[in-house]
A protein has these predicted regions:
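Conserved NAD(P)H cofactor-binding loop of Rossmann-fold oxidoreductase domains
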Residues: 76-83, 222-223
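Substrate-binding pocket helix/loop in short-chain dehydrogenase/reductase
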Residues: 83-87, 91-96
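Active-site helix of classical SDR
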Residues: 110, 144, 152
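Alpha-helical segment proximal to the catalytic Tyr-Lys
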Residues: 115, 156-158, 211
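Residue(s) in the substrate-gating loop at a strand-loop-helix junction
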Residues: 128
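Active-site loop immediately N-terminal to the catalytic Tyr-X3-Lys motif
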Residues: 133-139
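C-terminal helical subdomain
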Residues: 162, 166-169, 183-224
Length: 232
């Protein structure tokens, strides 16, 4: 499938590692010109925390000026939060931190990138299957990803001329996931994606090949959520 992304100007947040880094590599492999915003250092990274509005706004402007504008924006910056912590042990501050990064950070990214996006531009945000399903000890994370899905739909209605979609993968083998799940990912009893799998989904949603797709949450979970509770 042709992506027609060669020469396009792409901004990726959270692009120094994990899914974000996989997206950076995938876009560059297609010939796109990519700028990276991350709070961690790295080659060609413009450093900013997505929860710091002035810093993020300046970083977006820096990348956009370097690239001569933006055609695609990909929001991959995120945190998992206190995974495995029961509700009673979850503080309001801990809950707020997850939403600040995963939700407000995406909002601020879109807000400050929009002036640089032309008609026909595309925004892809990183959601999760946790927007639709849940496991114990994941209330903050699930709430944040549910908000990303709702915000994606609202943005698609609010902003004409730019497409907004989000990818919602199940567990992905990334440094963040390994920090939460540890050795479970060495021999998992459930299907696990690689960061490159998600990057290919992002490429499709960012490309003209997905022109009619707008306001959608693309759930990629190996069909797990499709199963009935009725015993097979």
């Amino acid at each position: 499938m042709r992506t027609d992304l060669a020469g396009k100007a792409v901004l990726v947040t959270g692009g120094a590692s994990g899914i974000g880094l996989a997206c950076v590599r995938a876009f560059r492999a297609e010939g796109a010109r990519v700028g990276v915003v991350d709070r961690a250092p790295g080659p060609d990274v413009v450093r900013a925390d997505v929860t710091d509005e002035p810093a993020l706004a300046a970083a977006v402007d820096t990348v956009a000026r370097r690239l001569g504008g933006l055609d695609v924006v990909v929001g991959c910056a995120g945190v998992s939060g206190p995974v495995g912590t029961p509700l009673a042990g979850t503080s309001a501050a801990g809950f707020a931190t997850v939403l600040a990064v995963n939700v407000t950070g995406q909002f601020l990214l879109v807000k400050h990138a929009l002036p640089w996006l032309p008609d026909g531009g595309a925004v892809v945000l990183l959601g999760s299957d946790s927007a639709f399903t849940a496991a114990p000890g994941m209330v903050p994370y699930c709430a944040s990803k549910g908000a990303v899905v709702a915000m994606t739909r609202a943005l698609a209605v609010e902003v004409p001329g730019v497409r907004f979609n989000c990818v919602c993968p199940s567990v992905v083998d990334t440094p963040m996931a390994r920090a939460d799940l540890g050795a479970v990912l060495d021999d998992p009893a459930f299907p696990v994606q690689q960061a490159g799998d998600v990057a290919r989904q992002v490429l499709f949603l960012a490309s003209p090949a997905s022109r009619p797709v707008n306001g959608q949450a693309v759930l990629a979970d190996f069909g797990m959520s499709a199963r009935s509770a009725f015993p097979a």
